[in-house]
Amino acid sequence: MTNIKSVIEKSMKAIKNKGFKGQINVFSTESKNASFSNGKLEQLTEGEKGAVGIKVISPDGRTATASSNIFTEEGIMQAVEKAIEMIKYTEKDDANDISNDEEFTYIDWAFDTDTKDMDLHEVMNLAQELEKKAKSEDERIKFVRGAEYEVALTRIHFGNTNGLYKNALFTNAAGSISLAAIEGEDSSFGFDYQLSQSYRLIDIDRIVKDSVEMAVSGLKSEVLSSGRYDIVMSPFASSMFLGTLITPLSGENVYKGKSFLKDKLGEKVANSSVTLLHDPMNGSAPIIASFDNEGTNTSRFNVIENGNLKVFLHNIYSAKKLGAKPTGNSFASVESPNPSIGTINLHFIANKTRKDILN
């Protein structure tokens, strides 16, 4: 498909001519990937995958979605027709709507030409180097389950029947490793990964060091007694912890009564030292976005500030239901092209650090 914008305009015109509102997300990712395990090349791939997500809303608020991985005008129009056909089976709800955020910031600092232009042989060499360095880092590393390196170029196009058209282009590089340390009868698993906008920011030596330290530190480990401890969470553990907060902070879950935070807006929900920031346009983050996949412009805001819950994460639907404004937190992907509430670059702000713990 040579002119995606033209096809988006045609598909939205077809929806509008039926008297409906609609939106479309088009994702395309070109990637190169290599992985090694115990000295053997396990995977070497280069290719492109894509997906199209369609949402249609009737005048009485019924809505239906459809998706397709056929990147032709015919394939996209078939998805549109499928969504229109399904809409009669859904319930009326006047909170279903589309964005009218016309202006947006085109992000060009998330694209790295050298990362885009890396060939498959270079990617393979980096994956192999990652494995070799891990094996030589410590004699107790006996087994590398997987050393992987990948570079990708992603294109995103969004349009709707209000005439919006927004697009983004960005690169990513990622390195990861999983390995095992063995000493006598003891064994322990370690892993680490990095994701960035450019291959230059992937530090293979750091990945090796952190994964080996994790594996070796688990040898001859002991189970702690139950109690209250000061802890320092690794970046991976922190990300898993933050992931558990997205569900209760979702405006849809609040509206449906599924969140334990539903009556806590404006109240203290955490220690005063806790500030939780959503910062989707942070230039140093591995993934950034100036608009979400409903076309709402993103922004930087505190979800929790000094322990107080300031705002929920909203898409257009939940914002209308709760009398709020959309926060730009409706995201989709090439794997799931119709959006749901999520975050990009959600992280804690360190108000105070106990140096006596870290030292």
Name each model-derived stretch.
Residues 1-359:
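N-terminal small-residue-enriched
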